[in-house]
Swiss-Prot record:
Residues 25-39 have a biased composition (Polar residues). Residues 11-39, 453-477 are annotated as: Disordered. Interacts with ATG8a and ATG8d. The active site is at C173 (nucleophile), D368, H370. GO terms for biological process: autophagy; protein transport; proteolysis. GO terms for molecular function: cysteine-type peptidase activity; endopeptidase activity; protein-phosphatidylethanolamide deconjugating activity. This is Cysteine protease ATG4b. It comes from Arabidopsis thaliana. Cysteine protease that plays a key role in autophagy by mediating both proteolytic activation and delipidation of ATG8 family proteins. The protease activity is required for proteolytic activation of ATG8 family proteins: cleaves the C-terminal amino acid of ATG8 proteins to reveal a C-terminal glycine. Exposure of the glycine at the C-terminus is essential for ATG8 proteins conjugation to phosphatidylethanolamine (PE) and insertion to membranes, which is necessary for autophagy. In addition to the protease activity, also mediates delipidation of PE-conjugated ATG8 proteins.
Length: 477
Protein backbone atom coordinates (compact mmCIF):
# COMPACT_ATOMS: atom_id res chain seq x y z
CA UNK A 1 0.00 0.00 0.00
CA UNK A 2 1.37 3.37 -0.92
CA UNK A 3 1.45 5.95 1.81
CA UNK A 4 -1.25 8.46 1.01
CA UNK A 5 -0.29 12.03 1.67
CA UNK A 6 -3.04 14.57 2.17
CA UNK A 7 -5.16 11.57 3.04
CA UNK A 8 -8.62 12.86 2.18
CA UNK A 9 -8.29 15.79 4.57
CA UNK A 10 -6.14 16.68 7.58
CA UNK A 11 -7.21 13.85 9.85
CA UNK A 12 -8.99 14.38 13.13
CA UNK A 13 -7.75 11.03 14.37
CA UNK A 14 -5.38 12.09 17.07
CA UNK A 15 -1.82 11.03 17.52
CA UNK A 16 0.47 11.02 20.46
CA UNK A 17 3.19 12.48 18.30
CA UNK A 18 3.59 16.20 18.86
CA UNK A 19 4.33 16.83 15.22
CA UNK A 20 1.22 14.97 14.15
CA UNK A 21 -1.19 16.05 16.89
CA UNK A 22 -4.71 16.17 15.56
CA UNK A 23 -7.82 17.87 16.88
CA UNK A 24 -9.76 15.48 19.09
CA UNK A 25 -11.67 18.02 21.11
CA UNK A 26 -14.27 18.67 18.45
CA UNK A 27 -17.29 16.42 17.93
CA UNK A 28 -17.33 13.93 15.11
CA UNK A 29 -17.21 15.81 11.83
CA UNK A 30 -20.53 15.87 10.02
CA UNK A 31 -19.59 18.34 7.30
CA UNK A 32 -17.32 17.85 4.34
CA UNK A 33 -13.78 18.86 5.08
CA UNK A 34 -11.87 21.03 2.64
CA UNK A 35 -10.07 19.14 -0.07
CA UNK A 36 -7.03 21.32 0.42
CA UNK A 37 -4.60 21.41 3.32
CA UNK A 38 -1.79 23.72 4.36
CA UNK A 39 1.91 23.07 3.87
CA UNK A 40 2.30 22.00 7.46
CA UNK A 41 -0.17 19.16 7.01
CA UNK A 42 1.50 18.22 3.75
CA UNK A 43 4.88 18.06 5.43
CA UNK A 44 3.55 16.01 8.33
CA UNK A 45 1.85 13.39 6.22
CA UNK A 46 4.59 13.31 3.59
CA UNK A 47 7.48 13.11 6.04
CA UNK A 48 8.21 9.48 5.27
CA UNK A 49 8.22 10.15 1.53
CA UNK A 50 10.57 13.11 1.87
CA UNK A 51 12.79 11.37 4.41
CA UNK A 52 13.31 8.32 2.27
CA UNK A 53 13.44 9.57 -1.28
CA UNK A 54 14.11 13.27 -1.60
CA UNK A 55 17.45 14.75 -2.61
CA UNK A 56 17.29 16.85 0.54
CA UNK A 57 17.39 13.77 2.75
CA UNK A 58 20.35 12.50 0.79
CA UNK A 59 22.05 15.86 1.31
CA UNK A 60 21.43 15.59 5.05
CA UNK A 61 22.91 12.12 5.20
CA UNK A 62 26.01 13.19 3.29
CA UNK A 63 26.52 16.18 5.55
CA UNK A 64 26.11 14.05 8.65
CA UNK A 65 28.63 11.45 7.54
CA UNK A 66 31.16 14.11 6.55
CA UNK A 67 31.14 15.60 10.04
CA UNK A 68 29.62 18.92 8.97
CA UNK A 69 26.40 20.42 10.20
CA UNK A 70 23.47 19.12 8.20
CA UNK A 71 22.93 21.50 5.32
CA UNK A 72 19.18 20.96 5.54
CA UNK A 73 19.10 23.25 8.55
CA UNK A 74 19.84 26.28 6.42
CA UNK A 75 17.12 28.58 5.15
CA UNK A 76 17.73 27.71 1.52
CA UNK A 77 17.56 24.00 2.24
CA UNK A 78 14.26 24.39 4.07
CA UNK A 79 12.97 26.07 0.94
CA UNK A 80 14.04 23.00 -1.02
CA UNK A 81 12.30 20.78 1.51
CA UNK A 82 9.08 22.74 1.19
CA UNK A 83 9.20 22.55 -2.59
CA UNK A 84 10.05 18.85 -2.52
CA UNK A 85 7.27 18.12 -0.03
CA UNK A 86 4.83 20.10 -2.14
CA UNK A 87 5.77 18.10 -5.24
CA UNK A 88 5.50 14.81 -3.34
CA UNK A 89 2.19 15.87 -1.86
CA UNK A 90 0.77 16.70 -5.27
CA UNK A 91 1.88 13.41 -6.75
CA UNK A 92 0.48 11.36 -3.89
CA UNK A 93 -2.71 13.41 -3.87
CA UNK A 94 -3.23 12.49 -7.52
CA UNK A 95 -2.47 8.86 -6.66
CA UNK A 96 -4.95 8.97 -3.79
CA UNK A 97 -7.64 10.46 -6.01
CA UNK A 98 -7.16 7.66 -8.52
CA UNK A 99 -7.21 4.90 -5.91
CA UNK A 100 -9.75 6.04 -3.32
CA UNK A 101 -11.57 8.77 -5.16
CA UNK A 102 -12.13 12.34 -3.99
CA UNK A 103 -12.65 13.21 -0.35
CA UNK A 104 -15.99 12.08 1.04
CA UNK A 105 -16.70 12.85 4.67
CA UNK A 106 -19.63 13.40 7.00
CA UNK A 107 -23.25 12.29 6.80
CA UNK A 108 -25.50 13.17 3.90
CA UNK A 109 -28.75 15.05 4.36
CA UNK A 110 -30.57 11.78 3.81
CA UNK A 111 -32.91 10.64 6.57
CA UNK A 112 -32.22 6.99 5.79
CA UNK A 113 -31.30 4.84 8.74
CA UNK A 114 -27.66 4.15 9.55
CA UNK A 115 -26.41 0.71 10.55
CA UNK A 116 -23.19 0.52 12.56
CA UNK A 117 -22.03 -3.02 13.36
CA UNK A 118 -25.50 -4.33 14.09
CA UNK A 119 -26.91 -1.19 15.73
CA UNK A 120 -29.52 0.90 13.90
CA UNK A 121 -29.67 4.69 14.12
CA UNK A 122 -32.97 5.94 12.72
CA UNK A 123 -32.96 9.54 11.57
CA UNK A 124 -36.36 11.17 11.15
CA UNK A 125 -37.01 14.41 9.33
CA UNK A 126 -39.49 16.80 10.83
CA UNK A 127 -39.96 19.69 13.18
CA UNK A 128 -39.55 20.39 16.88
CA UNK A 129 -39.43 17.14 18.85
CA UNK A 130 -38.58 15.00 15.81
CA UNK A 131 -35.63 17.24 14.97
CA UNK A 132 -34.46 17.05 18.57
CA UNK A 133 -34.75 13.27 18.44
CA UNK A 134 -32.72 13.21 15.22
CA UNK A 135 -30.05 15.29 16.91
CA UNK A 136 -29.85 12.84 19.78
CA UNK A 137 -29.68 9.91 17.37
CA UNK A 138 -26.81 11.50 15.46
CA UNK A 139 -25.00 12.29 18.71
CA UNK A 140 -25.36 8.65 19.78
CA UNK A 141 -24.09 7.50 16.40
CA UNK A 142 -21.08 9.82 16.62
CA UNK A 143 -20.22 8.52 20.07
CA UNK A 144 -20.55 4.91 18.91
CA UNK A 145 -18.36 5.52 15.85
CA UNK A 146 -15.66 7.36 17.79
CA UNK A 147 -15.57 4.53 20.37
CA UNK A 148 -14.53 1.98 17.75
CA UNK A 149 -10.85 1.06 17.91
CA UNK A 150 -8.67 2.51 15.16
CA UNK A 151 -5.39 0.97 14.03
CA UNK A 152 -3.16 2.93 11.66
CA UNK A 153 0.30 2.92 10.18
CA UNK A 154 2.86 3.35 12.96
CA UNK A 155 6.51 4.29 12.85
CA UNK A 156 9.32 3.96 15.33
CA UNK A 157 8.62 0.42 16.53
CA UNK A 158 11.20 -2.30 17.05
CA UNK A 159 12.34 -4.08 13.85
CA UNK A 160 10.05 -6.82 12.57
CA UNK A 161 11.82 -10.16 12.88
CA UNK A 162 15.18 -10.19 11.10
CA UNK A 163 14.26 -7.23 8.90
CA UNK A 164 15.08 -3.55 9.29
CA UNK A 165 11.43 -2.46 9.06
CA UNK A 166 10.52 -0.11 11.91
CA UNK A 167 7.35 1.15 10.21
CA UNK A 168 4.55 -0.39 8.17
CA UNK A 169 3.96 2.71 6.05
CA UNK A 170 3.22 1.85 2.40
CA UNK A 171 2.34 -1.80 2.97
CA UNK A 172 0.59 -2.57 6.27
CA UNK A 173 -2.96 -1.29 5.71
CA UNK A 174 -4.55 -4.73 5.28
CA UNK A 175 -2.84 -5.96 8.44
CA UNK A 176 -4.06 -2.90 10.34
CA UNK A 177 -7.58 -3.42 9.01
CA UNK A 178 -7.47 -6.97 10.33
CA UNK A 179 -6.24 -5.71 13.70
CA UNK A 180 -9.23 -3.37 13.89
CA UNK A 181 -11.71 -6.17 13.27
CA UNK A 182 -10.09 -8.44 15.86
CA UNK A 183 -9.82 -5.65 18.41
CA UNK A 184 -13.51 -4.94 17.92
CA UNK A 185 -14.36 -8.59 18.55
CA UNK A 186 -12.41 -8.48 21.81
CA UNK A 187 -14.09 -5.22 22.77
CA UNK A 188 -17.55 -6.73 22.23
CA UNK A 189 -16.61 -9.86 24.16
CA UNK A 190 -15.05 -8.17 27.20
CA UNK A 191 -16.99 -4.91 27.46
CA UNK A 192 -20.15 -5.52 25.41
CA UNK A 193 -21.59 -3.84 22.33
CA UNK A 194 -23.00 -0.95 24.37
CA UNK A 195 -19.59 0.16 25.71
CA UNK A 196 -18.62 3.73 24.85
CA UNK A 197 -15.34 5.54 25.42
CA UNK A 198 -15.72 8.45 27.85
CA UNK A 199 -12.86 10.91 27.98
CA UNK A 200 -14.14 12.33 31.27
CA UNK A 201 -13.61 9.03 33.09
CA UNK A 202 -10.49 6.93 33.76
CA UNK A 203 -9.90 4.34 31.06
CA UNK A 204 -11.33 0.90 31.73
CA UNK A 205 -8.61 -1.65 32.50
CA UNK A 206 -10.16 -4.20 30.11
CA UNK A 207 -10.11 -1.60 27.34
CA UNK A 208 -6.44 -0.81 27.99
CA UNK A 209 -5.64 -4.51 28.07
CA UNK A 210 -7.09 -4.89 24.57
CA UNK A 211 -4.98 -2.01 23.22
CA UNK A 212 -1.90 -3.49 24.90
CA UNK A 213 -2.45 -6.75 23.01
CA UNK A 214 -2.07 -4.86 19.72
CA UNK A 215 1.06 -2.92 20.65
CA UNK A 216 3.82 -2.74 18.06
CA UNK A 217 6.23 -5.12 19.75
CA UNK A 218 6.81 -8.86 19.80
CA UNK A 219 5.76 -8.86 23.45
CA UNK A 220 2.21 -7.95 22.40
CA UNK A 221 0.23 -11.03 21.41
CA UNK A 222 -1.48 -9.53 18.35
CA UNK A 223 1.15 -7.11 17.15
CA UNK A 224 1.93 -6.71 13.49
CA UNK A 225 5.21 -8.50 14.30
CA UNK A 226 3.48 -11.66 15.53
CA UNK A 227 0.81 -11.57 12.83
CA UNK A 228 3.47 -11.59 10.11
CA UNK A 229 5.27 -14.47 11.81
CA UNK A 230 2.07 -16.50 12.09
CA UNK A 231 1.16 -15.79 8.46
CA UNK A 232 4.45 -16.62 6.77
CA UNK A 233 2.95 -19.72 5.16
CA UNK A 234 0.21 -17.53 3.65
CA UNK A 235 2.60 -15.03 2.12
CA UNK A 236 2.78 -12.46 4.91
CA UNK A 237 6.11 -10.64 5.04
CA UNK A 238 7.27 -7.23 6.18
CA UNK A 239 7.13 -4.86 3.23
CA UNK A 240 4.65 -6.96 1.23
CA UNK A 241 0.93 -6.46 0.68
CA UNK A 242 -1.50 -9.37 0.96
CA UNK A 243 -5.20 -9.87 0.40
CA UNK A 244 -8.09 -10.54 2.80
CA UNK A 245 -7.98 -14.34 2.51
CA UNK A 246 -4.33 -14.56 3.56
CA UNK A 247 -4.94 -12.17 6.45
CA UNK A 248 -7.94 -14.19 7.67
CA UNK A 249 -5.92 -17.41 7.62
CA UNK A 250 -3.04 -15.67 9.38
CA UNK A 251 -5.31 -14.51 12.20
CA UNK A 252 -6.64 -18.04 12.52
CA UNK A 253 -3.07 -19.31 12.90
CA UNK A 254 -2.12 -16.59 15.37
CA UNK A 255 -5.18 -17.27 17.55
CA UNK A 256 -4.42 -20.99 17.54
CA UNK A 257 -0.78 -20.34 18.42
CA UNK A 258 -1.79 -18.08 21.28
CA UNK A 259 -4.03 -20.80 22.70
CA UNK A 260 -1.41 -23.52 22.39
CA UNK A 261 1.48 -21.55 23.87
CA UNK A 262 -0.22 -19.95 26.87
CA UNK A 263 -2.07 -21.36 29.84
CA UNK A 264 -5.75 -20.70 30.47
CA UNK A 265 -5.00 -17.87 32.90
CA UNK A 266 -2.94 -15.89 30.40
CA UNK A 267 -4.80 -16.55 27.16
CA UNK A 268 -5.15 -13.31 25.21
CA UNK A 269 -7.80 -14.41 22.71
CA UNK A 270 -10.52 -16.45 24.42
CA UNK A 271 -12.64 -17.23 21.39
CA UNK A 272 -12.58 -19.74 18.57
CA UNK A 273 -11.84 -18.61 15.01
CA UNK A 274 -13.47 -20.24 12.00
CA UNK A 275 -12.89 -19.44 8.33
CA UNK A 276 -15.87 -19.91 6.03
CA UNK A 277 -14.73 -20.86 2.53
CA UNK A 278 -15.65 -23.14 -0.34
CA UNK A 279 -12.98 -25.66 0.62
CA UNK A 280 -10.17 -26.10 3.10
CA UNK A 281 -7.65 -24.32 0.90
CA UNK A 282 -10.08 -21.57 -0.10
CA UNK A 283 -9.79 -22.41 -3.80
CA UNK A 284 -13.24 -23.60 -4.64
CA UNK A 285 -15.39 -21.48 -6.87
CA UNK A 286 -18.91 -20.42 -5.98
CA UNK A 287 -20.40 -19.11 -2.78
CA UNK A 288 -18.54 -20.21 0.37
CA UNK A 289 -20.39 -22.66 2.59
CA UNK A 290 -20.79 -22.33 6.34
CA UNK A 291 -21.16 -25.89 7.56
CA UNK A 292 -22.65 -26.02 11.06
CA UNK A 293 -20.93 -29.35 11.75
CA UNK A 294 -17.55 -27.78 10.96
CA UNK A 295 -18.21 -24.82 13.24
CA UNK A 296 -19.28 -27.18 16.02
CA UNK A 297 -16.04 -29.12 15.58
CA UNK A 298 -14.01 -25.89 15.75
CA UNK A 299 -15.75 -24.93 19.00
CA UNK A 300 -15.25 -28.38 20.55
CA UNK A 301 -11.56 -28.33 19.68
CA UNK A 302 -11.19 -24.86 21.16
CA UNK A 303 -13.01 -25.77 24.38
CA UNK A 304 -11.11 -29.08 24.52
CA UNK A 305 -14.25 -31.18 24.76
CA UNK A 306 -16.13 -29.07 27.28
CA UNK A 307 -19.86 -28.83 26.75
CA UNK A 308 -20.02 -25.05 27.03
CA UNK A 309 -20.04 -23.39 23.61
CA UNK A 310 -17.24 -20.79 23.42
CA UNK A 311 -17.47 -17.38 21.75
CA UNK A 312 -16.55 -17.68 18.09
CA UNK A 313 -15.30 -15.31 15.41
CA UNK A 314 -16.44 -16.15 11.89
CA UNK A 315 -14.45 -14.80 8.95
CA UNK A 316 -15.80 -15.05 5.40
CA UNK A 317 -13.27 -14.11 2.67
CA UNK A 318 -15.01 -13.38 -0.62
CA UNK A 319 -14.31 -12.34 -4.20
CA UNK A 320 -17.48 -10.76 -5.57
CA UNK A 321 -16.65 -9.84 -9.13
CA UNK A 322 -13.81 -8.78 -11.41
CA UNK A 323 -12.67 -5.16 -11.16
CA UNK A 324 -15.23 -4.15 -8.57
CA UNK A 325 -18.06 -5.65 -6.56
CA UNK A 326 -20.85 -6.93 -8.78
CA UNK A 327 -23.95 -4.80 -8.01
CA UNK A 328 -25.99 -7.96 -7.39
CA UNK A 329 -24.13 -8.49 -4.10
CA UNK A 330 -24.45 -4.97 -2.69
CA UNK A 331 -27.93 -5.42 -1.11
CA UNK A 332 -26.66 -8.49 0.73
CA UNK A 333 -23.49 -6.70 1.87
CA UNK A 334 -25.63 -3.90 3.28
CA UNK A 335 -27.91 -6.41 5.01
CA UNK A 336 -25.01 -8.03 6.90
CA UNK A 337 -24.61 -4.82 8.91
CA UNK A 338 -28.10 -5.39 10.34
CA UNK A 339 -26.94 -8.64 11.96
CA UNK A 340 -26.33 -8.22 15.73
CA UNK A 341 -23.21 -10.31 15.14
CA UNK A 342 -21.76 -7.95 12.51
CA UNK A 343 -18.07 -7.04 12.69
CA UNK A 344 -18.01 -5.23 9.37
CA UNK A 345 -15.90 -5.71 6.26
CA UNK A 346 -12.19 -5.86 5.54
CA UNK A 347 -11.95 -4.17 2.18
CA UNK A 348 -11.70 -0.94 0.27
CA UNK A 349 -10.47 0.20 -3.10
CA UNK A 350 -7.95 -1.88 -5.09
CA UNK A 351 -4.66 -1.74 -3.20
CA UNK A 352 -6.02 0.40 -0.36
CA UNK A 353 -7.54 -1.58 2.49
CA UNK A 354 -9.92 -0.05 5.03
CA UNK A 355 -12.23 -1.33 7.77
CA UNK A 356 -15.86 -0.73 6.80
CA UNK A 357 -18.01 -0.49 9.94
CA UNK A 358 -21.34 0.95 8.86
CA UNK A 359 -23.69 1.70 5.99
CA UNK A 360 -26.27 4.28 4.98
CA UNK A 361 -28.05 3.65 1.70
CA UNK A 362 -25.34 2.79 -0.84
CA UNK A 363 -22.29 4.06 1.00
CA UNK A 364 -20.08 2.49 3.64
CA UNK A 365 -18.55 4.31 6.61
CA UNK A 366 -15.03 3.19 7.38
CA UNK A 367 -11.98 3.58 9.59
CA UNK A 368 -8.85 4.46 7.62
CA UNK A 369 -5.52 2.85 8.57
CA UNK A 370 -3.42 5.09 6.29
CA UNK A 371 -2.67 7.92 8.71
CA UNK A 372 0.94 7.70 9.92
CA UNK A 373 1.33 7.94 13.69
CA UNK A 374 4.14 7.47 16.16
CA UNK A 375 4.24 4.30 18.25
CA UNK A 376 2.34 4.50 21.54
CA UNK A 377 3.00 2.24 24.51
CA UNK A 378 -0.19 1.26 26.33
CA UNK A 379 -0.17 -0.63 29.62
CA UNK A 380 -3.34 -1.63 31.44
CA UNK A 381 -1.85 -0.41 34.72
CA UNK A 382 -1.51 3.14 33.39
CA UNK A 383 -5.03 4.58 33.23
CA UNK A 384 -3.70 8.04 32.38
CA UNK A 385 -2.16 6.96 29.07
CA UNK A 386 -3.29 8.93 26.01
CA UNK A 387 -5.26 6.55 23.78
CA UNK A 388 -6.68 9.19 21.45
CA UNK A 389 -4.59 7.88 18.54
CA UNK A 390 -6.69 4.69 18.69
CA UNK A 391 -9.92 6.51 17.87
CA UNK A 392 -11.25 8.68 15.06
CA UNK A 393 -13.77 11.51 15.00
CA UNK A 394 -13.92 11.99 11.23
CA UNK A 395 -16.62 10.10 9.36
CA UNK A 396 -15.41 8.92 5.97
CA UNK A 397 -17.42 6.93 3.48
CA UNK A 398 -16.98 5.13 0.20
CA UNK A 399 -19.62 4.14 -2.40
CA UNK A 400 -20.13 0.41 -1.96
CA UNK A 401 -20.25 -0.07 -5.73
CA UNK A 402 -16.62 1.05 -5.98
CA UNK A 403 -15.24 -1.52 -3.53
CA UNK A 404 -12.56 -3.96 -4.57
CA UNK A 405 -14.31 -7.34 -5.04
CA UNK A 406 -11.76 -9.06 -2.78
CA UNK A 407 -12.97 -8.54 0.79
CA UNK A 408 -13.85 -10.40 3.98
CA UNK A 409 -16.86 -10.33 6.30
CA UNK A 410 -16.56 -10.70 10.06
CA UNK A 411 -19.14 -11.92 12.59
CA UNK A 412 -18.87 -12.45 16.34
CA UNK A 413 -21.15 -14.93 18.12
CA UNK A 414 -21.07 -14.73 21.91
CA UNK A 415 -22.66 -18.13 22.59
CA UNK A 416 -24.57 -21.00 20.98
CA UNK A 417 -27.91 -19.19 20.85
CA UNK A 418 -26.19 -16.23 19.23
CA UNK A 419 -24.67 -18.54 16.61
CA UNK A 420 -28.05 -20.16 15.95
CA UNK A 421 -29.58 -16.71 15.45
CA UNK A 422 -26.78 -15.85 13.04
CA UNK A 423 -27.43 -19.01 11.00
CA UNK A 424 -31.14 -18.18 10.74
CA UNK A 425 -30.37 -14.66 9.56
CA UNK A 426 -27.70 -15.83 7.12
CA UNK A 427 -29.98 -18.48 5.64
CA UNK A 428 -32.75 -15.94 5.13
CA UNK A 429 -30.29 -13.50 3.56
CA UNK A 430 -29.16 -16.17 1.10
CA UNK A 431 -32.77 -16.95 0.27
CA UNK A 432 -33.50 -13.29 -0.43
CA UNK A 433 -30.41 -12.79 -2.60
CA UNK A 434 -32.07 -13.45 -5.98
CA UNK A 435 -29.61 -16.21 -6.76
CA UNK A 436 -26.49 -14.28 -5.72
CA UNK A 437 -25.75 -15.34 -2.12
CA UNK A 438 -22.64 -14.12 -0.34
CA UNK A 439 -22.41 -17.53 1.32
CA UNK A 440 -24.74 -20.40 2.16
CA UNK A 441 -25.45 -22.30 5.37
CA UNK A 442 -25.57 -26.09 5.57
CA UNK A 443 -26.00 -28.49 8.46
CA UNK A 444 -23.51 -31.17 7.42
CA UNK A 445 -21.32 -32.64 4.71
CA UNK A 446 -22.24 -35.87 2.99
CA UNK A 447 -20.79 -37.96 0.19
CA UNK A 448 -22.62 -39.40 -2.77
CA UNK A 449 -22.16 -42.86 -4.20
CA UNK A 450 -19.12 -41.71 -6.19
CA UNK A 451 -17.38 -40.42 -3.08
CA UNK A 452 -17.80 -36.79 -4.09
CA UNK A 453 -18.43 -34.40 -1.23
CA UNK A 454 -21.82 -32.73 -1.15
CA UNK A 455 -23.56 -30.53 1.36
CA UNK A 456 -26.81 -31.06 3.18
CA UNK A 457 -28.50 -27.72 3.55
CA UNK A 458 -30.03 -26.68 6.85
CA UNK A 459 -33.02 -25.30 4.96
CA UNK A 460 -34.72 -25.88 1.64
CA UNK A 461 -33.90 -22.31 0.64
CA UNK A 462 -30.19 -22.89 1.12
CA UNK A 463 -30.25 -25.94 -1.13
CA UNK A 464 -32.01 -24.05 -3.88
CA UNK A 465 -29.48 -21.24 -3.99
CA UNK A 466 -26.29 -23.27 -3.77
CA UNK A 467 -26.24 -24.27 -7.45
CA UNK A 468 -23.86 -23.01 -10.10
CA UNK A 469 -26.29 -20.98 -12.19
CA UNK A 470 -25.17 -17.66 -10.70
CA UNK A 471 -21.52 -18.34 -9.93
CA UNK A 472 -20.00 -16.71 -13.01
CA UNK A 473 -18.75 -13.67 -11.10
CA UNK A 474 -16.88 -15.62 -8.44
CA UNK A 475 -13.11 -15.92 -8.51
CA UNK A 476 -10.77 -18.40 -6.88
CA UNK A 477 -9.64 -17.10 -3.51
Amino acid sequence: MKAICDRFVPSKCSSSSTSEKRDISSPTSLVSDSASSDNKSNLTLCSDVVASSSPVSQLCREASTSGHNPVCTTHSSWTVILKTASMASGAIRRFQDRVLGPSRTGISSSTSEIWLLGVCYKISEGESSEEADAGRVLAAFRQDFSSLILMTYRRGFEPIGDTTYTSDVNWGCMLRSGQMLFAQALLFQRLGRSWRKKDSEPADEKYLEILELFGDTEASAFSIHNLILAGESYGLAAGSWVGPYAVCRSWESLARKNKEETDDKHKSFSMAVHIVSGSEDGERGGAPILCIEDVTKTCLEFSEGETEWPPILLLVPLVLGLDRVNPRYIPSLIATFTFPQSLGILGGKPGASTYIVGVQEDKGFYLDPHDVQQVVTVKKENQDVDTSSYHCNTLRYVPLESLDPSLALGFYCQHKDDFDDFCIRATKLAGDSNGAPLFTVTQSHRRNDCGIAETSSSTETSTEISGEEHEDDWQLL
